[in-house]
Design a protein with these regions (language model features):
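Extracytoplasmic/secreted proteins, especially bacterial periplasmic and envelope-associated proteins
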Residues: 45, 49, 78, 97, ...
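Helical hinge/lid and interdomain linker segments adjacent to catalytic or ligand-binding clefts
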Residues: 27-31, 38-121
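A glycine-rich, often tryptophan-bearing local segment used as a flexible ligand/cofactor-contacting loop or short
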Residues: 91-166
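Extracellular ligand-binding/catalytic regions of CAZymes and related secreted enzymes
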Residues: 25-26, 31, 52, 57, ...
Length: 287
């Protein structure tokens, strides 16, 4: 009898542990479009690297990956954060046809991570929702999209920078983002000074404009990765303009920073050394 009771107690405790783990698991939904090719805007494979790293981290993540907006009406049930890595602009492949659902998830406190071209939507309702979701976005005739080498000489103390050292990365770093007024709720994470050569292009929706020239002339540092905490604790967001080149996922500091950002937007306590991961790309780390 005593032995039977002991076994029952062990079984009960074991089930409780597993139930607790399952209940506490954080659900991350990754959305991508077809992108461009294997080397640039490789959204599907980029998401796959991040999703696998989260699953393998043993931190209690449950992930789902979709190409395009999910047709399954239950895809977002219980979601803690949504990662969007896709082409953007007026025909944003994921947001523009789903603004109502996007707004509902913001209202529900779901976290959001937008990367590279995915940070661009048209000014108006879509832009306003991006400000609510993650505190900033690429606005035509305000922001620009040149290629340049960003030198992140220092990083702020923040859960997203846990285990991340200053680094240099060549990328298509859009800058001069449209942020919340007075940067309210926004914490710059990646900031750098673009070279003056990024101002050599003629004026256009993405290339140059009087606003960015004024900012550059004033010597203002440009924030190209940022965290956002919504008012009244109603969710978190993160945006970054990097991610053009697929090879950059081989860089530990970049990969760790994005994994940390996903975890943070999902409400996970980021480990002091960052979310662990092993690079899966068989390529040389870019200089």
């Amino acid at each position: 009898m005593k032995l039977s009771y002991t076994r029952s107690l062990i079984l009960t405790l074991t089930l409780a542990v597993f139930s607790s783990f399952a209940f506490g698991a954080k659900k991350i939904v990754f959305l991508a479009d077809g992108g461009k090719n294997n080397e640039k805007h490789n959204h599907v494979d980029g998401n796959d690297i991040l999703a696998n790293a989260l699953e393998e981290s043993k931190l209690g993540f449950e992930t789902a990956q979709y190409k395009g907006w999910p047709t399954d009406p239950k895809a977002f049930d219980g979601v803690d954060s949504v990662v969007m890595f896709c082409n953007g602009g007026k025909k944003h492949h994921l947001v523009m046809k789903h603004l109502d659902q996007f707004e509902k998830m913001i209202n529900d406190g779901v976290g959001f991570v937008f990367m590279h071209y995915g940070v661009e939507v048209p000014k108006g309702r879509a832009g306003d929702l991006m400000l609510r979701a993650m505190g900033g976005y690429f606005e035509e005739h305000w922001s620009v999209n040149p290629h340049w080498k960003a030198d992140f000489k220092s990083l702020p103390k923040h859960p997203i920078t846990s285990g991340v050292k200053p680094f240099v990365q060549d990328d298509e770093w859009y800058y001069h983002m449209r942020f919340q007024p007075n940067m309210k709720g926004v914490t710059p994470i990646l900031s750098a000074h673009p070279p003056q050569s990024t101002m050599n292009r003629p004026d256009g929706p993405h290339s140059n404009n009087p606003h960015v020239r004024k900012s550059m002339a004033a010597g203002e540092i440009q924030h190209i990765g940022w965290a956002y905490e919504r008012p009244n604790g109603k969710g978190r967001g993160f945006g970054t303009t990097g991610g053009h080149y697929h090879k950059t996922w081989a860089r530990d500091d970049w990969r760790t920073l994005i994994l940390n950002a996903i975890a943070w937007t999902a409400g996970v306590e980021v480990p002091k050394d960052g979310v662990p991961s092993i690079p899966t790309l068989n390529i040389a780390i870019p200089k």
